[in-house]
């Protein structure tokens, strides 16, 4: 999913008019755009697919291509834009994140399998959210950037589409 101010998400709506943006919490200053296959397909139809990224010697490619990265760079001009991804099943899985600021990649795509057991503040999603201005509200797992931003209330992109507040960009 993409995370950023409305201005950074607006270019995606120009490519895919059906793209939907949501606020996860009341008074949010950052918003999310769940990346569906339709959005990826439209972006890749307009600009080419590019290469799928494989990060950190992993055997798993990210749901991110070189085309996605170039477009995110352009979309972040004048603001910041993050890309975050989680893939968990039965409590185990991976998370990934990247950030662009003012058109430049400021946090390269990072993938972390749970087996690496890095402290929560150093995991890619929390690091990306922190770079976007989200501050953890306390200590412990339930008060990290992920929880503060409101992601803990949703188990999937489908939950966000069903339950979060849709906003106009």
Regions found by a protein language model. Give the residues of each.
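Long, compositionally biased intrinsically disordered terminal regions
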Residues: 102, 106-169
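Compositionally biased, intrinsically disordered low-complexity regions enriched in proline and serine
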Residues: 13, 23, 48, 147-150, ...
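Short, extreme N-terminal segment that most often corresponds to the first beta-strand
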Residues: 1-25, 166-169
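Short, intrinsically disordered low-complexity segments
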Residues: 18-95, 99-101, 105-106, 111, ...
